[in-house]
Amino acid sequence: VNHTLWQVPSSMQAYKNDIDADLYKQFAASLYGKSVDEVTKAERQLAKVAQLGLGFGAGHKSFQNIARLMGGFDLTLDEAYEIVSSWRQTYSEIVQGWKTCHSSLSWIDNGIAESIDPWGHCVTDSRGVRTPVGRINYPDLRQQTNEDGNTEWVYGQGRKEARIYAGKVTENLVQHLARNIIADNMLAFDKTPYGRKYRPAHTVHDELIYVVDETDADGVLDTLNELMKTPPTWWPELVTSAEGDIAQTYGGAK
């Protein structure tokens, strides 16, 4: 979603060519200067950590910690810096998106209607951001000076007061859109014969989990995969993919 929201050409072309394109391997190939076929399992894993950890503005010091926690990689600061720099250069459209998200806070504060993303899906107003599937509100948005003497954006009051900044706005937009894509998939499944029989047992970020009779397991999985590979009606240009598994436990299916 993050790559398509900001129209990253290489990523969109990759998914256009192959719905199951592996962006982790593609970034690893770019990072290490080798072909996709030559990328090792460890190199792909580090690239996966980069794709998942760098999309919302993390710097090299934060990424050093992210790499250790998410992938068990013990990177030097220089190595972390090199990876972050390479990622930002490769996906410069996302970096530009962060800058636009920073500007959007001023637009909201001034009640100006402006499109944040190039698709025109996320539009500011005096309350926050309107999207095709709802809105994100930033009540009492304002600038104030923190204890270090720096000016920052915050919203909310009392215990609900929170900092808001470019990377967090980006994350809010991406997760809001992604959550609604999954919700659309879930509602579409509800209208199928299997969906009328089974309700979701749980959802986790970009996953739908169902507990079903063993005789229906293959049919349910095939139906869900088909639906989750169908782009939402409000964003037909988005390429979506899906994979799943059948197991006796949730952990066994991951």
Regions found by a protein language model. Name each.
Residues V1-K254:
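Conserved catalytic core of nucleotide polymerization and phosphodiester-bond processing enzymes
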